[in-house]
């Protein structure tokens, strides 16, 4: 907060006429905005105000200014807290002093949270909310702040209640824009809680409010982006990759519209409308991110790579000027997705270096590490499968299961752990227990179309290894039906090649060929290196069995090329120091196993 900004709202002549006060304030602001800032001198100027035994209004405002400067520009949180507590205490005794009173409450509760004194922040915010009902801007802002605090504590029920209160208050004070923000925020939390029956009517209402609201074009489009992001993520959570396409297209058009609008100062007539969801640049990265999520699920991995590169470039530019924690969250989620892409496309060494980079990013923030530790271990488990370290894969997935409460992630991990047990071939008891928990025919734990299709595939794979071919075909045809319905290309390719293998074993070469050829075409399009390797081996054997020697030779050559590429990448990955991360299953990742100079990826120059 600018220390001079306060003078713009100082109405009593007692403040404005004190020339000593204005002079000290001017010096303080000069030192604060110097390049580099001279914070110590700024603080001295503000402290000097107290030497003049100022009136209560100046005293309270100066405590707020000192607390703000110390909080934002120094590590002296104790002194910042003392000044903010005094500002809050004194300002409550002064009538019509809302700007200082509620700014102090907001900043002080933020500081309490930073010091892990959440129990001090909550009653402070509740008191401020209680006495701010005649000040729409501050009442809404404080409700948002307390809801966010509850969300960070994973108390989503209390957060939803507060957002509901905020939505009703915004309606009463005639702010449909801020009502939509409260409702969309509540919808986001309901999606996180998987309360889908409550989400659908709420999103329908939000859609109507957004379309009917006539106001600033950037604010209107930002509401539409928020609304569409919720719809897209809802579809993606449900694994409905094809159904989401119209919404995703609308979202991409919407962000293009926003990028053409001028960032004029928004000065709404209703003070309750003085909010925005995200800066335009952040929204742009978010749209890239959901596009990457869609491309990853659909199996368009080159497209996922392209949008990841664009998003990471944008993020690096933004992070030079903006320390907002959401940017680090975006970066982490992007890396999580691109790592999975690398493992599929046969770039294990690069994936491993990016896992190391992810570890470093998460270690910069305890909250980031807490929120993404399960994903980190899951990615390491997937890497372990790719380099055939099955014991380590099991340890990583078991650790990830211990750390997650997210049902979709839990199901994803269990599905992959089941594939590890199938490959090991001697873990039948554990495997049966796992398969019972992800039975796609009965009480499947999540509503995700994609994960249910994957569960059918895992059942088919297990039946194949046990020689129960008719049962395997039933499961795989179910996977094919589901994956074709939603354009899940990787699952389609995997199911086709496994069906082709079954028909080959049964001696039905024609039917096998009908499965393997499209599997190979689809795997090349993705590109999925493992399925290409498997398909080329089958094509070689099929053509040899049918006496097609030229085709058999061509397929053998392809298989040899894929084998060489994968072997070379395997050797490179296992020789990296980061490979030792596969043994990490507890606490923070060991620093000695991480690359100290960052990854040498295609993005090295940008990162």
UniProtKB/Swiss-Prot annotation:
Plays an important role in the loading of the cohesin complex on to DNA. Plays a role in sister chromatid cohesion and normal progression through prometaphase. GO terms for biological process: cell division; chromosome segregation; maintenance of mitotic sister chromatid cohesion; mitotic sister chromatid cohesion. Coiled coil: none annotated. The keyword Membrane does not apply. The gene is mau2. Interacts with one or more paralogs of nipbl to form the cohesin loading complex. Its main location: nucleus. This is MAU2 chromatid cohesion factor homolog. Pfam families: Cohesin_load. Keywords: Cell cycle, Cell division, Chromosome partition, Mitosis, Nucleus, Repeat, TPR repeat. PANTHER family: MAU2 CHROMATID COHESION FACTOR HOMOLOG. It is found in: Nucleus, Nucleoplasm. GO terms for cellular component: chromatin; nucleoplasm; nucleus; Scc2-Scc4 cohesin loading complex; SMC loading complex. Belongs to the SCC4/mau-2 family. It comes from Xenopus laevis (African clawed frog). TPR repeats lie at residues 102-135, 374-407, 453-486, 493-526.
